[in-house]
Amino acid sequence: KYADYIERAFKIDNTAAFITPGHPEIELALVRLYKATGEKRYIELAKYFIDKRGNCDEPGIYTDWANEYYSQDEIPVRERKTAEGHCVRALYLMCAAADIAYIYKDNDLKTACERFFDSIVNKRMYITGGGGSSNMGESFTIDYDLPNRTAYAETCAAISLAMFAERMLKFGADSRYSDIIERTMYNGIMSGISLDGKSFFYENPLEIDPDFNNINTSTKVKERFPITQRVEVFDCSCCPPNIMRFVASISGLIYGFDDNTVYINQYMNSEGD
């Protein structure tokens, strides 16, 4: 019923206060709802939201840093060439774009997804698979801007990159995508949780020096640095449940298959049938 209400507000009656639904998540939910119910209007609504991004005639309501780039609304998805804006938002949006491209056999959208993937892994990703180098807007910045001590590299960003790579594998066996899942799983995601499973990193810096935390060692000027210890709760505790969701999904990442072949995408103790 709620999905039907969203369809009515955003697509049929146009009574919603804004054109695109903000943080990209509803698109992924609509794809799953379509698969669960077979109701085509849900996948059509997901496609509608993808098509509307960057295509709105009316200006959005933004702040200085929470702007069109932050909201993935600066350019149509099919024209996207680089990874921009809020890292997790961008990746969730492109997860849905990959789903839509696969279901509709949309080659233009698939090509945009490939460009986006290449932009991240070749120029805007840490060696750990972490993404997003700035705390301002939790965002991508420019090519090769990947400082270690101030790395944002949100745990959710690594998870969403693994989710995106998993979807890109649907287009055909390509080890680039399974390799990225492996890299993020062991380095960018599991770094976000303590061994006892009780404490978490929201950000995952590649270098921590407690003696100089929040101080630029070159200029001695105070700067913002990530926390140095994992904690149990954040003001925005999106990462802990996301880690739990990812861990529960690992078994589905091990194998891939088509009509004639079974592919081993992740090397770990497992059995398949």
Q: Which sequence ranges carry the predicted segments?
A:
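Glycan-recognition and catalytic cores of secretory/periplasmic carbohydrate-active enzymes
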Residues: 1-273
